[in-house]
Regions:
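Phosphate/NTP-binding elements of NTP-utilizing enzymes
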Residues: 1-169
């Protein structure tokens, strides 16, 4: 675990209390979008009545490096409450996080949106929470399909061309 601590400002606490179905965190590289968004995303997963959720990045390697295993990432922040099953396990053959909550275990599938064949296989049901890292680089078909199947969406993005579909939709 990291020796860094996640300190919560009054503004951050207000953000955590804000209950909306869709949230976008836009800012420059290293602005802190990921640690801020991930923490709230995991809290939303814990509150969700649904068991299945999705965490998406360009590919699973990017998700592991930038989201799951980084300092102040999911494993760092939630420790023994979360197990990463990078090769899948048991009932679920695709990479996922097993999140132990007081309401029972939750599954967070780790999906790469860079390969259409793989994400097409991953989508096919209803999900509680969806986290899309760098949504401005994601396949817009993935964004549409995944968002339609989820109750809550948290997305991060770096400033980009305002003409992109992700800004229009």
């Amino acid at each position: 675990m990291s020796t860094e601590r996640l300190l919560l400002s009054d503004k951050y606490k207000a953000f955590l209390r804000c209950d909306v179905p869709t949230e976008f965190l836009e800012g420059t590289t290293a602005a802190g979008k990921t640690p801020v968004g991930l923490f709230k995303f995991i809290l939303k997963v814990a509150e969700s009545p649904k068991k299945l959720h999705i965490l998406a990045a360009d590919d699973t390697g990017a998700a592991e490096k930038n989201i799951i295993q980084k300092d102040l990432g999911i494993l760092d922040d939630f420790g023994v409450l979360v197990e990463y099953k990078g090769n899948g396990s048991g009932e679920y053959k695709m990479p996922h996080l097993l999140f132990h909550t007081s309401g029972g275990d939750k599954i967070i599938f780790v999906v790469g949106y860079g390969n259409k064949r793989k994400w097409k296989d991953a989508l096919g049901g209803q999900y509680g929470c969806l986290y899309i890292d760098e949504i401005n680089t994601a396949d817009i078909e993935f964004v549409r399909e995944a968002a339609m199947r989820s109750d809550y969406l948290m997305a991060t993005l770096n400033p980009d061309d305002p003409g992109l579909d992700v800004y229009k939709e």
